[in-house]
Amino acid sequence: MKWCKRGYVLAAILALASATIQAADVTITVNGKVVAKPCTVSTTNATVDLGDLYSFSLMSAGAASAWHDVALELTNCPVGTSRVTASFSGAADSTGYYKNQGTAQNIQLELQDDSGNTLNTGATKTVQVDDSSQSAHFPLQVRALTVNGGATQGTIQAVISITYTYS
């Protein structure tokens, strides 16, 4: 009888041991990033008034309004943040420029940096952070244009969104 009980105990121990042998492996994956702390965005919203434009001056293909300046300012950039990249997005029309979402037809909006580079949707612009003031400055300009000519009377409106990344 003792042998029989020992056999059951031994069988139970082996059963438990084999259960632990068949346990599944567990993997813990840890992800993260070390990033630069963001600057304070001083220019949270900017409005550019193009004023009244005359349809007769926007009849021919390539005609455009005067440039209007707009500046994006970032301040309080932490030490260690050396560059700020702005990514531009907005509704584009078939010409690639920003689409006029107002009522005037055959009008597009063009955004450029101070070097004359066009910043259509999807474009990026990187500037250095000024070490002495811990700030970054994006001087930009915008205008209305008609790629194909034949602008009609109506309103002009576009929304351009900017997302910043820091390094």
Swiss-Prot record:
Keywords: Disulfide bond, Fimbrium, Signal
Cellular compartments per GO CC: pilus; pilus tip
Signal peptide range: 1-23
Entry's localization field: Fimbrium
InterPro entries in alphabetical order: Adhesion_dom_fimbrial_sf (IPR036937), Adhesion_dom_sf (IPR008966), Bact_Fimbrial_Adh_Pro (IPR050263)
Keyword Signal in annotation: yes
GO-annotated biological processes: cell adhesion; cell adhesion involved in single-species biofilm formation; cell-substrate adhesion; mechanosensory behavior
Family: Belongs to the fimbrial protein family.
Function: Involved in regulation of length and mediation of adhesion of type 1 fimbriae (but not necessary for the production of fimbriae). Involved in the integration of FimH in the fimbriae.
Stated name of the protein: Protein FimG
Organism: Escherichia coli (strain K12)
